[in-house]
Amino acid sequence: MDSKESLTPGKEENPSSVLTQERGNVMDFCKILRGGATLKVSVSSTSLAAASQSDSKQQRLLVDFPKGSVSNAQQPDLSKAVSLSMGLYMGETETKVMGNDLGFPQQGQISLSSGETDLQLLEESIANLNRSTSVPENPKSSASSSVSAAPKEKEFPKTHSDVSSEQQNLKGQTGSNGGNVKLYTADQSTFDILQDLEFSSGSPGKETNQSPWKSDLLIDENCLLSPLAGEEDSFLLEGNSNEDCKPLILPDTKPKIKDNGDLVLSSSSNVTLPQVKTEKEDFIELCTPGVIKQEKLSTVYCQASFPGANIIGNKMSAISIHGVSTSGGQMYHYDMNTASLSQQQDQKPIFNVIPPIPVGSENWNRCQGSGDDNLTSLGTLNFPGRTVFSNGYSSPSMRPDVSSPPSSSSTATTGPPPKLCLVCSDEASGCHYGVLTCGSCKVFFKRAVEGQHNYLCAGRNDCIIDKIRRKNCPACRYRKCLQAGMNLEARKTKKKIKGIQQATTGVSQETSENPANKTIVPATLPQLTPTLVSLLEVIEPEVLYAGYDSTVPDSTWRIMTTLNMLGGRQVIAAVKWAKAIPGFRNLHLDDQMTLLQYSWMFLMAFALGWRSYRQASSNLLCFAPDLIINEQRMTLPCMYDQCKHMLYVSSELHRLQVSYEEYLCMKTLLLLSSVPKDGLKSQELFDEIRMTYIKELGKAIVKREGNSSQNWQRFYQLTKLLDSMHEVVENLLNYCFQTFLDKTMSIEFPEMLAEIITNQLPKYSNGNIKKLLFHQK
């Protein structure tokens, strides 16, 4: 027969379970073989004899007949009859088996008497098979075991009908094999065709029936879900308005929807589809385009377990799609019960990742967006852009009434972790002298400062200070307290700020309690916001210790190296201080770095002069509490000239009797005393900030002198001192650059200080610095 043609019955044929013919017999296998197609066969003794002789090998492979039970004469081909009852056609892969009707051509006229004679032989053979065959059912021999359940003679009623129209359709369709219909090729001469198929755990073959053909197939005239179905076969589902499921649609079929919600099948026949079957496991295909970035990967399916998913008879029917991969031969099963979702919304599904579908099922993956727009109401599996699950279930993060359970891995904490002392790592008792310390270090620091003890380290000033060894070396403990930032002035400043806040609160309460002030606006409002000078007092850096060992004989190299290391730490403190100045961080970041690179020596020299003025009456240079340059140390080589410039600043502060508020304002103005010749990126804002602190210096002068005629004279003297700082800093920088470039002196520089000097050297050599002076020379 022609392999390119399909065996398609006419539209007027009734797909009933019992079919009649005028000159033939009717065999009904549907009662025994569920899932098989009802077959209509017209048999002749001649054709059956020829088929028996040509396919004798197939019969021997099919069943084992007992000796003497059936004669070796002409026997009807049982493999064809039973195979056709199962809806399988193994001879030609492109031939399609349709619906519940199966027709195939025969040659010549078929007589009723010959058909009855052959039918008797068939019944005898089946009876012998019933006595000899006792093989239990299993997933791989489910089709073979169906043969033993053949119907008896009374199940084949003899009726007659006119089949002339069918013979017209089948006329001339005989092949080159002499008119005999050959159901199997040489390499397919076996009846148990399911032995090579490995069914998945969710496939129909794993059911109690142990037969994948005992499920209701979703078929029409143009498609059949069988292992021989090609990738072009369609899958059509029955849908109604109560179903909340979207069928998988291939590109070649586009179902339509009626007004009542039913699907209009694209098939040419009006075959009533069976009720969709509910299976044991539930699978959900999660497609979230627009929510998660899509990658060109194979679709991954998730298995969701919902309670009550196998309820049969619910109005909300489930999806059950059965298909076979043509590449791997493995059957997959996907279904979803939406009734349990709508009934138990608060039940959270458990998702397990299922491996991607093989290549043969890629057509199923293209169901997204392949149908018409009106099909989106049929299901909620492939809604694009949806951020929550269908049927009212949403993720816990999207539902305010559902709180996610706490993680089992999180440990219950009774309270916050204990805070440790920054000096000895013991449990801290609070913030003492501006630092979080324990009570022991608090008392030690207070006694060390007030008692003015001159502690000396017996080692190398690097002793370990912890809870056990903190009493071994008081010198290193005191040094660590200073490095942590402990300062007695911090306590006084805290009390001062607290007193100002209490006074301000008392004044505001008195003003609010006075009924006369409720309607009358006072002439002068109290100063509720802190002044710039008070803020400058709070952010002033703490005094740092140099860690210099006075027991070792002094040398220029050791003193210079110690001063450089101290200078590097002071630069870091100056950067933090500058960032805390009101208005400074509003400047461009490049401008902030430029101002710090130009003014770091101004800040350290002016602070050194202030400490020397307050602690030694400008006679000594107090670099640190543990490093004071006296007259004896000044006589060391290369020390006197530099110390002379620094003593000038201290002597001027002592001569003018500069107050602390004036010193803070002058120090801030020194930060803003040098700019590049090309100007800053935020030059206007810089000029505004600088003018603000010039006015603050004037306010500090008025606060000290009062409304006297000497205010302008003092302002002139203080600004003149600021201008003289340029000459002092210039001499100090020249010596610093010389020692930095002269490697023979072997003077060490900290990393940050070396970086600043490296960036500053070319600017000074090129003269790219503009001095902001108050007075002309």
Swiss-Prot record:
* Primary residence: cytoplasm
Q: Where is this cross-link: Glycyl lysine isopeptide (Lys-Gly) (interchain with G-Cter in SUMO)?
A: 277, 293, 703
A GO cellular component term found in this entry reads: chromosome
Residues with Phosphothreonine modification: 8
Matches recorded under Pfam families: GCR, Hormone_recep, zf-C4
Q: Where is the composition biased (Polar residues)?
A: 164-174
PTM note: Acetylation by CLOCK reduces its binding to glucocorticoid response elements and its transcriptional activity.
Q: Where is the NR LBD domain?
A: 524-758
* SUPFAM superfamilies per the UniProt record, alphabetical: Glucocorticoid receptor-like (DNA-binding domain) (SSF57716), Nuclear receptor ligand-binding domain (SSF48508)
Among InterPro entries, the record links this protein to:
Glcrtcd_rcpt (IPR001409), NHR-like_dom_sf (IPR035500), Nucl_hrmn_rcpt_lig-bd (IPR000536), Nuclear_hormone_rcpt_NR3 (IPR050200), Nuclear_hrmn_rcpt (IPR001723), Znf_hrmn_rcpt (IPR001628), Znf_NHR/GATA (IPR013088)
Compositionally biased residues, Basic and acidic residues = 1-14, 151-163
Entry protein name? Glucocorticoid receptor
Give the organism the record lists: Saimiri boliviensis boliviensis
